[in-house]
Amino acid sequence: MSKIANGNWNETKWQPLRAGIERVVFAMEADTLCCTIGRVENGNEVKPHTHPNEQVALVLEGECDYYVAGVPYRLTAGSWVTVPPNVEHYIHVYDSPVPCLQIDIFTPDRPEYTESFTAFLAEEEGK
């Protein structure tokens, strides 16, 4: 059963994923969804991928092109796009005045994200 939880991503360490991309996983106590906030720098490595999860990508700051099924969607602060399950997609940040800050909501849950982020936090605490 899901637990009630709260927090502030500004008070959490950011997990580096690859050059120019880092994230915080939150709502880890939820049973049926996963939420992340990502910070993506200009010139990020473009990495097309698919997954069985439905996804909503919502931009809070900055700008990006978000490709879904080969179609580019220009996202600015307040913009969002949905990604159906198993559809190729990726983010491309190349001319944003600030790093692109975006929230991703996935359903069903992404336990691999929770496990990876939990391990990252434990490693950081051990330093």
Residue ranges and their predicted role:
Residues M1-T32, F117-K127:
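A short, N-terminal "cap"/entry segment at the start of jelly-roll beta-barrel domains
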Residues R18, T32-L33, G38, Y90-K127:
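Double-stranded beta-helix
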Residues C35-T50:
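Conserved short histidine dyad/triad with adjacent acidic residue
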Residues N42, P52, V71, V87-E88, ...:
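A generic "binding-loop/recognition-motif" signal
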Residues N53-C64, A69:
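Glycine- and acidic-residue-biased ligand/ion/polar-headgroup-sensing regions
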Residues E54, T82-V83, D104-P108:
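Hydrophobic alpha-helical segments of small multi-pass membrane proteins
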